[in-house]
Regions:
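Catalytic NTP-binding/metal-coordinating core of nucleotidyl cyclase/transferase enzymes
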Residues: 1-71
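Short beta-strand-to-loop capping motifs
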Residues: 13, 59-63, 207-214, 333-335
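Catalytic beta-strand-to-alpha-helix segment of the class III nucleotidyl cyclase homology domain
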Residues: 64-171
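Intrinsically disordered, glycine/charged-rich C-terminal tails and inter-domain linkers
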Residues: 142-145, 149-219, 253, 280, ...
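Hydrophobic ligand-binding cavity/cleft-lining segments
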Residues: 194-268
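Hydrophobic pocket/interface hotspot
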Residues: 217-221, 227, 243, 276, ...
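Short beta-strand segments that buttress and anchor functional surface loops
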Residues: 272-281, 300-307
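Beta-strand/loop substructures that line and gate deep hydrophobic ligand-binding cavities in soluble
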Residues: 303-360, 364-368
Length: 368
């Protein structure tokens, strides 16, 4: 096999050894699997997963990736957002589920040469630069949350806010490098709202009433065209509290617009943290479910809608009414409660259009 050259990136779950040593194996294994799956899901397109190594993910890239640091920071935030949803979703009192928040993430980035070998039907990689990258996981950086970059890696990526550092590796020598502290990035993951919008939180609200039962309204929302473009989040009001329509991450939404794709399952088997990506007008709008309750009398679901230059929370309440049922929609721009945050004027119009479609579908079902 020819010698290849590129970026070597390792993501390591910090604190996992202590976590697994002091908790129940079956649940700690499930938790690690979900976290590693989250890392793999949000891997930048220019990185290729070379191997899953216990509590670490190992990527390679032979492409120029100047924005790698920004991508890894996003990955760190996504990891901690997932941890938060896992904590919110679990009802298990075991030590593993109760202490999942103690885990965190660190990265090592190096650039060097390696050789790909095919062994027993699988690719394996060898080379002194791979050894170096893995040895750097055990280091003297005064943190558990960081990106450690060798000077070889720094020559090909953009990295601001670095702290100079060096490590001495036995049989290799002194390695000049730098690290970026990530602890402050936790705030971005914890800033996302996890509660429904109260009436006083809403910057805009609208209500539709239907001369039909809650179940009939749900049936109408299952109609392929009821919610229209960008309306996949309405399915979260009528679907049971399992992954949307029973779908798996990476699949299209059953019965929905073909531009809607379920990209991430909910945490710990719930719907919390579930993501739908809406591809519309060349843009991608992320719809992340942050809270949901449902029974035969109604539903409440709050979605975080993240698009180009906007971030909006939408709480939808489907409930019984004296004349049948009603849907109330509340909207607020992030950060909620900040007088400076402005709700894009088009959002209320889009929501009202969706509600009009649902009303038409309910009426059509009643005439059938």
């Amino acid at each position: 096999m020819p010698v290849e050259n590129g970026l070597i990136v390792l993501a390591d779950v910090s604190g996992y050894t202590e976590f697994i040593a002091t908790t129940e194996l079956d649940h700690s294994r499930e938790i690690l699997g979900e976290l590693l799956g989250t890392l793999c899901e949000c891997a930048p397109g220019s990185l290729t997963i070379a191997q899953i190594e216990g509590d670490a993910v190992f990527w390679l890239s032979d492409q120029e990736t100047p924005a790698l640091v920004a991508l890894l920071k996003d990955k760190f935030v996504e990891f901690h957002r997932r941890l938060r949803f896992m904590t919110l979703a679990t009802t298990c009192p075991c030590r593993a589920c109760a202490s999942v928040g103690s885990l965190t993430l660190k990265f090592v980035v190096h650039r060097g040469s390696y050789v790909r070998q095919r062994v027993a039907g699988s690719d394996h990689f060898v080379g002194i630069d791979l050894v170096l990258a893995h040895r750097l996981l055990k280091n003297t950086v005064p943190s558990h949350e960081y990106i450690l970059l060798t000077d070889a890696a720094l020559a090909s990526v953009t990295a601001d806010g670095t702290v100079r550092h060096e490590e001495t590796i036995e049989h290799i020598g002194t390695i000049p490098c730098a690290y970026i502290e990530l602890s402050d990035m936790r705030c971005a993951a914890l800033a996302e709202r996890t509660e429904h919008l109260a009436p006083g939180d809403a910057q805009a609200a609208t209500v539709r009433t239907f001369p039909a039962s809650v179940e009939r309204v749900r049936d109408a929302m299952r109609d392929e065209g009821a919610a229209g473009p960008r309306g996949a989040h309405y399915q979260l009001l009528e679907d049971p509290p399992t992954p949307v329509g029973g779908a798996a991450a990476g699949s299209r939404i059953p019965g929905g617009d073909p531009t809607h794709e379920l990209t991430r399952d909910g945490a710990r088997g719930s719907v919390l943290g579930q993501e739908i990506h809406c591809h519309h007008d060349g843009q991608i709008e992320v719809m992340r479910l942050i809270k949901s309750e449902r029974d035969q009398h109604g539903s409440v679901a709050t979605t975080h809608l993240i698009g180009a230059h906007r971030s909006v929370y939408l709480t939808q309440i489907l409930s019984e009414s004296p004349t049948g049922s009603r849907i109330e929609a509340r909207l607020a721009s992030e950060p909620v409660g900040d007088p400076a945050s402005q709700l894009p004027p088009s959002f209320l119009a889009i929501v009202e259009e969706h509600l009009d479609r649902i009303a038409a579908a309910v009426a059509g079902a009643g005439e059938a």
